[in-house]
A protein has these predicted regions:
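N-terminal secretory signal peptides that target proteins for export/translocation
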Residues: 1-7
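Classical Sec-dependent N-terminal signal peptides that target proteins to the secretory pathway
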Residues: 8-24
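Long, contiguous binding/interaction regions
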Residues: 24-81, 87-223
Length: 223
């Protein structure tokens, strides 16, 4: 009886060690993507050769990790491109971005960035027939019910309630450009869109100052 128990114990240990050994050789979805991207690094770097096909394949590979993941690739600067790993503004996909970024390969021609970064506001944003330039949008902070969030009013020149949806999309894109994907999703709460004819317009600030003013308030939130 004692020998039987001892044999069962040995078998269990062997199985446990065997499963552990197998797990060492089984790659995660993130590791598989990194391996694939390293193998195809030059092809992706020169994506202009066949942009649609290469970008489609990139998206397919990312979706194997998480269906909400997406990417951005910058123009060449000093022999390098930026590769942005994005959750497309979906908070639930943030951990997937963090995990993939933690396994980023070291490639001389690439700089990997997690989440869409802040960018200087220089260009107008157009959706359908509505175009808003930086001078046509201003902001004002408001208190949010969630104390860990910052509420904001965006004043868009030309805004009407009938076209609220389009101007809301434009306003969100400006926020994303100004503050970056991470800060918008983590710290921006209520977003209200209004026109230049709103009674509080005179209290508004030019959109170019949004990052600086936001960071002043954010410091107090994350303490």
């Amino acid at each position: 009886m004692g020998n039987k128990k001892e044999n069962e114990k040995i078998i269990f240990i062997i199985r446990f060690m065997f499963m552990g050994l197998i797990s060492c050789f089984v790659k995660t979805k993130e590791e598989k993507f990194c391996g694939w991207s390293c193998k195809n690094s030059q092809l992706i770097y020169n994506y202009e050769i066949n942009q649609e096909k290469i970008f489609n394949e990139l998206q397919i590979q990312l979706h194997k990790i998480n269906p909400d993941l997406t990417f951005e690739i910058s123009s060449v600067k000093n022999g390098k491109r930026d590769f942005v790993i994005s959750a497309d503004g979906i908070l639930d996909a943030f951990p997937a971005v963090e995990k993939l970024y933690s396994l980023k390969p070291e490639l001389s021609e690439w700089t990997f960035i997690k989440f869409r970064p802040r960018r200087k506001i220089e260009n107008s944003i157009k959706i359908e027939d509505k175009e808003v330039c930086p001078n046509d949008i201003r902001f004002m902070f408001i208190k949010d019910e969630d104390k860990s969030k910052i509420g904001i009013v965006l004043f868009c020149n030309g805004y009407t309630e009938i076209e609220c949806e389009i101007y809301s999309q434009i306003g969100f894109l400006f926020l994303d450009e100004c503050l970056g994907e991470y800060d918008v999703e983590k710290f921006i709460g209520t977003i209200i869109i209004q026109g230049f004819d709103n009674e509080y317009f005179n209290d508004s600030i030019k959109i170019e100052f949004l990052p600086t003013e936001f960071d002043k308030i954010k410091v107090n939130i994350i303490k």
